[in-house]
Regions:
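Bacterial N-terminal signal peptides that target proteins for export
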Residues: 2-16
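C-terminal segment of classical bacterial N-terminal signal peptides
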Residues: 17-28
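Beta-alpha junction/loop-to-helix N-cap segments that form part of ligand/metal-binding clefts
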Residues: 33-36, 49-56, 63, 67-143, ...
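Venus flytrap/periplasmic-binding-protein-like
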Residues: 83, 130-132, 136-141, 218, ...
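Extracellular/periplasmic Venus flytrap/periplasmic-binding protein
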Residues: 89, 139, 147-259, 264, ...
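Extracellular/periplasmic periplasmic-binding protein-like sensory domains
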Residues: 253-334, 418-419
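Segments of small-molecule ligand-sensing domains
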Residues: 314-327, 338-414
Length: 446
C-alpha cells in the first residue's frame, strides 16, 4: 500500500517537473539563476532566409551555452516574436518581449534598420542595449550621444567607404575615380538610404557622379530601374536590397541588360548564399562585403554542430546551413551578447548571477574581442577583431570583400577599413552632435 502511494507521489512529482520545465522561470530554475533574452525574429516575409539563419544561430548558441553550464552558471532563457521585418510589428514585439516572468530584457536586436529607428528612442529610458550588428542608425556609433546604442562591430558608412575604396583599387587609384559614374540602387526605406550621407560626400570629394535610384518595397519589380541603369551606363552599381527575392531579381535584371556582375557590389544583407542561388548563373561574379565570413570549419561552429545538432536541439530546419553567411552573422551577434554578459558579471561583482540592463550596458561597452579571445571562443577569422569604448560604439569598422563563383563565395580581401577612418568618424560625430543639439541632449563625457 505504502509503495503504491510513493509511486503515485513520484509520478505526480515527475509530471510537475516536466510541466514546470516548459516555462521560463525568473532568477532561479531549480537552483540555477537565469538571464532572459528576446528574439525579435523575421522568419516570415521577404527576409525569411536572413531571419531563419540569423536568429536560428542565436538560439543555437544560447542552447550551446546552456549545454555547457551557462554563463558562469547562469542559464539563458529566451522568447521569440515575429516582426516580419516590419517596423510597426517590431515595436509590438519589443513591447511583448520586454518582460517575461518578472525579468526584463537587457538587449534588443531587430536586424532591421527601419525597426531600429522605430525603437531607438526608448533604449535609454528602458535601460536596454540596442545591438545594431552592422545595421541601423549609423551615428549611434557615437556613445557620447547614444550611450545605449551600439553598432558593434561595423556600420553602413564604414561599409560604403570600404566598397568605394575597393572600386578605386580596381580602377587604379582614387585619382582614377574622377568622372566615373556610380548608381546606388536601393530599396526605398531608411535602410536603403542609410549609406547616402557618407556616399554623397566621398563621391563629391572624388569627382564621382552619384545617381540614386530607389525601388519600392518589397523590391521584386525592378524593370524600370534597370532600364534607367542601361541608359545611364554607370561604371559601378552599389546594391542595397532587402530579402533574397529582391536581391536575386537584381542579378537577373543585370544579366538581362548585360550589365557586368563584377561591377556590382552587394550590401551585407544581400551577401549570402540564399541571395545568390535563386539567380543561378546570373549571380556569378557579383561582389559583396561581409562582416562575418561563411565557413563551417570554425571550431565553435563544429562544436555547435556536434553538441546542439547532435542532440537534436538545432534550430535550423536544414542543418546544411550551418556555417552559412547569415547563420555565422547571427552567431557573431550572440557571442557579443554573452561576452557582454560575462564582462558585466565581472565588472559588477555578479559572477554566477543575472545582470541588470545598466550592468549589461557596461559589459557590452567593455567588449574587447582580440584575436586571442576570438580564438578562445572558436571564431578567429570569422569576424574582425575589435573593441568598444565609451565614445566609439562601432569598433572595427572593417569588412571583407567576397565574390560569388556560382557555388560559394571566394574571399577577395582581408579585413579592410575605410580609406580614411577618421573622415568617417568625423561624419558620425557631426551627425550625432546635430541630433543632440536638436533634441537638447548633453553628450556624455568620456
Amino acid at each position: 500500500m505504502i509503495n503504491k502511494i510513493v509511486k503515485k507521489l513520484l509520478s505526480a512529482l515527475t509530471m510537475m517537473v516536466a510541466i514546470l520545465s516548459t516555462f521560463a522561470i525568473p532568477q532561479t530554475v531549480f537552483g540555477a539563476e537565469t538571464q532572459y533574452f528576446p528574439v525579435a525574429s523575421s522568419r516570415v516575409g521577404p527576409s525569411s532566409a536572413m531571419g531563419t539563419g540569423y536568429y536560428g544561430a542565436q538560439i543555437d548558441y544560447m542552447n550551446y551555452v546552456n549545454m555547457n553550464g551557462g554563463v558562469n552558471g547562469v542559464m539563458l532563457t529566451w522568447q521569440e516574436c515575429e516582426t516580419e521585418y516590419n517596423a510597426v510589428k517590431t515595436v509590438e514585439c519589443y513591447q511583448r518581449l520586454f518582460e517575461k516572468d518578472g525579468q526584463r530584457i537587457v538587449v534588443f536586436d531587430t536586424l532591421a534598420t527601419p525597426g531600429a529607428y522605430a525603437v531607438i528612442n526608448r533604449m535609454a529610458k528602458d535601460n536596454v542595449v540596442l545591438a545594431q550588428y552592422g545595421y541601423g542608425r549609423t551615428d549611434g556609433a557615437d556613445g557620447r550621444v547614444w550611450p545605449w546604442v551600439f553598432n558593434a562591430a561595423s556600420h553602413y558608412w564604414s561599409q560604403i567607404a570600404v566598397k568605394l575604396k575597393f572600386m578605386a583599387q580596381i580602377e587604379g587609384g582614387v585619382d582614377k575615380m574622377k568622372g566615373k559614374k556610380i548608381v546606388h540602387l536601393h530599396i526605398d526605406s531608411a535602410y536603403g538610404r542609410e549609406p547616402l550621407p557618407a556616399m554623397r560626400k566621398i563621391c563629391s570629394d572624388w569627382g564621382v557622379k552619384l545617381i540614386e535610384i530607389s525601388i519600392p518595397p518589397p523590391g521584386l519589380e525592378q524593370q524600370s530601374q534597370w532600364l534607367q541603369i542601361r541608359r545611364e551606363k554607370p561604371d559601378w552599381v552599389t546594391f542595397w536590397g532587402a530579402g533574397s527575392g529582391m536581391n536575386s531579381t537584381a542579378m537577373t535584371n543585370a544579366a538581362r541588360i548585360n550589365f557586368p556582375r563584377d561591377r556590382m557590389m552587394y550590401v551585407t544583407f544581400g551577401a549570402a548564399e540564399e541571395d545568390m542561388y535563386p539567380a543561378g548563373n546570373a549571380a556569378i561574379g557579383t561582389y559583396a562585403v561581409a562582416n562575418a565570413l561563411p565557413g563551417a570549419d570554425f571550431p565553435l561552429v563544429k562544436k555547435i554542430k556536434e553538441q546542439v545538432y547532435g542532440a537534436g536541439k538545432g534550430n535550423l530546419a536544414d542543418p546544411k546551413r550551418l556555417g552559412s553567411v547569415y547563420w555565422n552573422r547571427g552567431l557573431g551577434a550572440a557571442v557579443m551578447w554573452i561576452e557582454g554578459m560575462r564582462n558585466a558579471q565581472k565588472m559588477h561583482n555578479k559572477v554566477g548571477k543575472a545582470v541588470t540592463g545598466a550592468e549589461f550596458r557596461d559589459g557590452y561597452e567593455a567588449l574587447n574581442m582580440t584575436e586571442a579571445r576570438l580564438g578562445e571562443i572558436g571564431i578567429k577569422g570569422m569576424v574582425a577583431p575589435f573593441s568598444i569604448s565609451c565614445a566609439n560604439h562601432e569598433g572595427a569598422g572593417k569588412f571583407a570583400v567576397m565574390q560569388w563563383n556560382g557555388e560559394s563565395f571566394d574571399q577577395i580581401t582581408g579585413w579592410e577599413a575605410p580609406g580614411d577612418p577618421a573622415f568617417i568618424r568625423g561624419l558620425v560625430e557631426s551627425s550625432a552632435a546635430k541630433f543632440a543639439k536638436e533634441n537638447n541632449i548633453t553628450p556624455k563625457k568620456c
